[in-house]
Amino acid sequence: MASDVRGRRKTKIGVVVSSKMEKTVVVRVERVYSHPQYAKVVRDSSKYYAHNELDVKEGDTVRIQETRPLSKTKRWRVVGRVN
């Protein structure tokens, strides 16, 4: 029932680049796509602040999920590690 109420939340997979804050990590998500006009393969990355209760470390590959705003910049939470 709870999953119906929350709806479908966005998920992303990325690498933890910083874990120096308490219960917060910075996750870099890379996206590779072909440019629509020039057909060149482009690599783009974004950094997300995510709530960390699983004690993940720098260099870990993790899955993050969209959640309610937890602070000024945190809108994601770590769901689990990806191996």
From Swiss-Prot:
Top-level taxon of the source organism: Bacteria
One GO cellular component term: cytosolic small ribosomal subunit
Alphabetical list of InterPro entries matching this protein: NA-bd_OB-fold, Ribosomal_uS17, Ribosomal_uS17_bact/chlr, Ribosomal_uS17_CS
Record has rRNA-binding as a keyword: yes
Keywords, alphabetical: Ribonucleoprotein, Ribosomal protein, RNA-binding, rRNA-binding
Molecular function GO terms recorded: rRNA binding; structural constituent of ribosome
Cross-referenced SUPFAM superfamilies: Nucleic acid-binding proteins
GO annotation terms (biological process): translation
Function: One of the primary rRNA binding proteins, it binds specifically to the 5'-end of 16S ribosomal RNA.
Family: Belongs to the universal ribosomal protein uS17 family.
Assembly with partners or alone: Part of the 30S ribosomal subunit.
Protein name stated in the entry: Small ribosomal subunit protein uS17
